[in-house]
Amino acid sequence: MFKKVLIVMAGLSVATMAHADNPTIRGTVASKCSVYTTTQGVFGNPSPNTLSTAPADGGVQPIVRYDVAIGNYYYGRITYPTSFTSSPNLTSSALEWTGDVDVSQVSVPGMSVYTTNAITYDNTVQYDLTLAGSTWFKISSEATYGYNQAFPAGSYVASVVAECIAK
Protein backbone atom coordinates (compact mmCIF):
# COMPACT_ATOMS: atom_id res chain seq x y z
CA MET A 1 0.00 0.00 0.00
CA PHE A 2 2.80 2.37 0.91
CA LYS A 3 4.45 1.69 -2.49
CA LYS A 4 1.23 2.62 -4.30
CA VAL A 5 1.00 5.91 -2.40
CA LEU A 6 4.63 6.74 -3.28
CA ILE A 7 4.03 5.94 -6.95
CA VAL A 8 0.91 8.14 -7.02
CA MET A 9 2.76 10.99 -5.24
CA ALA A 10 5.70 10.68 -7.63
CA GLY A 11 3.30 10.82 -10.57
CA LEU A 12 1.65 13.97 -9.19
CA SER A 13 5.04 15.54 -8.60
CA VAL A 14 6.08 14.95 -12.22
CA ALA A 15 2.78 16.38 -13.43
CA THR A 16 3.35 19.49 -11.33
CA MET A 17 6.87 19.95 -12.66
CA ALA A 18 5.63 19.73 -16.26
CA HIS A 19 3.30 22.71 -15.76
CA ALA A 20 4.41 25.83 -17.71
CA ASP A 21 3.54 29.47 -17.37
CA ASN A 22 4.09 32.53 -19.56
CA PRO A 23 4.82 35.51 -17.32
CA THR A 24 4.66 38.93 -18.92
CA ILE A 25 7.15 41.72 -18.58
CA ARG A 26 5.76 45.23 -18.82
CA GLY A 27 7.35 48.62 -18.86
CA THR A 28 6.45 52.18 -19.61
CA VAL A 29 8.79 54.55 -21.39
CA ALA A 30 8.40 58.25 -20.70
CA SER A 31 9.82 60.52 -23.35
CA LYS A 32 12.82 62.56 -22.34
CA CYS A 33 11.84 65.18 -24.93
CA SER A 34 8.74 67.38 -24.65
CA VAL A 35 7.31 70.13 -26.85
CA TYR A 36 5.27 73.07 -25.57
CA THR A 37 3.67 76.02 -27.34
CA THR A 38 4.79 79.16 -25.54
CA THR A 39 3.31 81.70 -27.98
CA GLN A 40 0.35 81.17 -30.30
CA GLY A 41 0.80 82.61 -33.79
CA VAL A 42 -1.36 85.34 -35.31
CA PHE A 43 -1.62 86.29 -38.97
CA GLY A 44 -1.28 89.97 -39.78
CA ASN A 45 -2.82 91.24 -43.03
CA PRO A 46 -0.37 93.85 -44.39
CA SER A 47 -1.95 93.84 -47.86
CA PRO A 48 -5.22 92.42 -49.23
CA ASN A 49 -3.51 89.33 -50.69
CA THR A 50 -1.04 88.56 -47.87
CA LEU A 51 -1.30 86.92 -44.46
CA SER A 52 1.92 86.92 -42.44
CA THR A 53 3.16 86.13 -38.95
CA ALA A 54 5.96 88.72 -39.27
CA PRO A 55 5.76 91.36 -36.52
CA ALA A 56 6.40 94.08 -39.14
CA ASP A 57 3.21 92.90 -40.88
CA GLY A 58 1.13 93.00 -37.69
CA GLY A 59 1.52 89.28 -37.04
CA VAL A 60 2.83 87.24 -34.13
CA GLN A 61 5.27 84.40 -34.73
CA PRO A 62 4.39 81.18 -32.93
CA ILE A 63 7.09 79.92 -30.56
CA VAL A 64 7.57 76.34 -29.41
CA ARG A 65 9.86 75.16 -26.62
CA TYR A 66 11.64 71.82 -26.62
CA ASP A 67 12.67 70.47 -23.22
CA VAL A 68 15.26 67.69 -23.51
CA ALA A 69 16.23 65.73 -20.38
CA ILE A 70 19.02 63.71 -22.02
CA GLY A 71 20.83 65.10 -25.05
CA ASN A 72 21.74 63.34 -28.29
CA TYR A 73 18.73 61.00 -28.36
CA TYR A 74 16.18 63.13 -30.22
CA TYR A 75 15.57 65.25 -33.28
CA GLY A 76 13.32 68.28 -33.11
CA ARG A 77 11.24 68.42 -36.28
CA ILE A 78 9.18 71.52 -37.04
CA THR A 79 6.94 71.87 -40.10
CA TYR A 80 5.48 75.24 -41.01
CA PRO A 81 2.08 75.31 -42.77
CA THR A 82 1.43 75.01 -46.50
CA SER A 83 -2.36 75.11 -46.22
CA PHE A 84 -5.11 76.46 -44.03
CA THR A 85 -6.83 74.07 -41.64
CA SER A 86 -9.78 76.46 -41.66
CA SER A 87 -10.59 79.43 -43.89
CA PRO A 88 -13.36 81.03 -45.93
CA ASN A 89 -13.94 79.51 -49.36
CA LEU A 90 -11.04 80.47 -51.62
CA THR A 91 -12.07 80.70 -55.28
CA SER A 92 -8.52 80.51 -56.62
CA SER A 93 -6.05 77.70 -56.08
CA ALA A 94 -3.19 80.17 -56.54
CA LEU A 95 -2.02 80.20 -52.93
CA GLU A 96 1.72 80.46 -52.29
CA TRP A 97 3.26 79.66 -48.92
CA THR A 98 6.67 80.55 -47.52
CA GLY A 99 8.05 80.10 -44.05
CA ASP A 100 11.04 79.51 -41.86
CA VAL A 101 12.07 78.21 -38.45
CA ASP A 102 14.77 79.83 -36.29
CA VAL A 103 16.25 79.26 -32.86
CA SER A 104 15.08 82.20 -30.76
CA GLN A 105 16.42 81.33 -27.28
CA VAL A 106 18.52 78.61 -25.62
CA SER A 107 19.20 77.52 -22.05
CA VAL A 108 22.70 76.23 -22.86
CA PRO A 109 25.14 78.31 -24.97
CA GLY A 110 26.28 75.23 -26.91
CA MET A 111 22.81 74.96 -28.45
CA SER A 112 23.66 77.89 -30.72
CA VAL A 113 25.00 75.35 -33.26
CA TYR A 114 21.48 73.97 -33.75
CA THR A 115 20.80 76.58 -36.44
CA THR A 116 24.06 75.82 -38.26
CA ASN A 117 23.46 72.06 -38.20
CA ALA A 118 19.75 72.17 -39.13
CA ILE A 119 18.50 70.13 -42.06
CA THR A 120 15.76 71.73 -44.16
CA TYR A 121 13.57 69.86 -46.62
CA ASP A 122 10.29 71.02 -48.14
CA ASN A 123 8.59 73.00 -45.36
CA THR A 124 10.28 71.08 -42.53
CA VAL A 125 13.34 71.95 -40.46
CA GLN A 126 15.00 69.23 -38.39
CA TYR A 127 17.37 69.94 -35.51
CA ASP A 128 19.69 67.45 -33.82
CA LEU A 129 18.97 68.03 -30.12
CA THR A 130 22.44 67.12 -28.83
CA LEU A 131 22.30 68.85 -25.44
CA ALA A 132 20.01 68.61 -22.43
CA GLY A 133 18.06 71.78 -21.70
CA SER A 134 15.44 73.99 -23.33
CA THR A 135 15.39 75.51 -26.80
CA TRP A 136 12.79 77.94 -28.14
CA PHE A 137 12.04 78.04 -31.86
CA LYS A 138 10.11 80.79 -33.64
CA ILE A 139 8.20 79.95 -36.79
CA SER A 140 7.42 82.39 -39.58
CA SER A 141 4.70 81.79 -42.12
CA GLU A 142 3.33 83.80 -45.02
CA ALA A 143 0.51 83.04 -47.44
CA THR A 144 0.07 85.05 -50.64
CA TYR A 145 -3.20 84.70 -52.51
CA GLY A 146 -3.38 84.69 -56.29
CA TYR A 147 -2.21 87.45 -58.55
CA ASN A 148 -3.70 90.69 -57.24
CA GLN A 149 -6.54 88.81 -55.51
CA ALA A 150 -7.72 89.78 -52.06
CA PHE A 151 -8.28 87.20 -49.33
CA PRO A 152 -12.02 86.97 -48.57
CA ALA A 153 -13.04 88.35 -45.17
CA GLY A 154 -13.13 85.78 -42.40
CA SER A 155 -11.03 83.74 -40.02
CA TYR A 156 -7.92 81.88 -41.20
CA VAL A 157 -6.21 79.09 -39.27
CA ALA A 158 -3.04 77.19 -40.15
CA SER A 159 -1.12 74.69 -38.04
CA VAL A 160 2.54 74.21 -37.24
CA VAL A 161 3.64 70.65 -36.45
CA ALA A 162 6.40 70.40 -33.82
CA GLU A 163 7.50 66.95 -32.68
CA CYS A 164 10.29 65.05 -30.94
CA ILE A 165 11.62 62.15 -32.99
CA ALA A 166 13.71 59.48 -31.27
CA LYS A 167 16.99 58.80 -33.06
Label for each model-derived stretch:
Residues 1-20:
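Gram-negative bacterial Sec-dependent N-terminal signal peptides
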Residues 2-3, 88, 116, 122:
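Generic cytosolic/nucleocytoplasmic N-terminal low-complexity/intrinsically disordered segments
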Residues 4-7, 123, 144:
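Generic preference for well-ordered secondary structure
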Residues 5-9, 34, 119:
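Residue-level detector of intrinsically disordered/flexible regions characterized by low predicted structural confidence
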Residues 18, 100, 117-118, 122, ...:
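Serine/threonine-rich, low-complexity intrinsically disordered segments
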Residues 19-94, 127-167:
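N-terminal small/polar-rich segments of proteins
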Residues 92-107:
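Short, surface-exposed beta-strand/strand-loop-strand elements in extracellular ectodomains
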Residues 107-131:
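Extended, solvent-exposed segments with strong compositional bias
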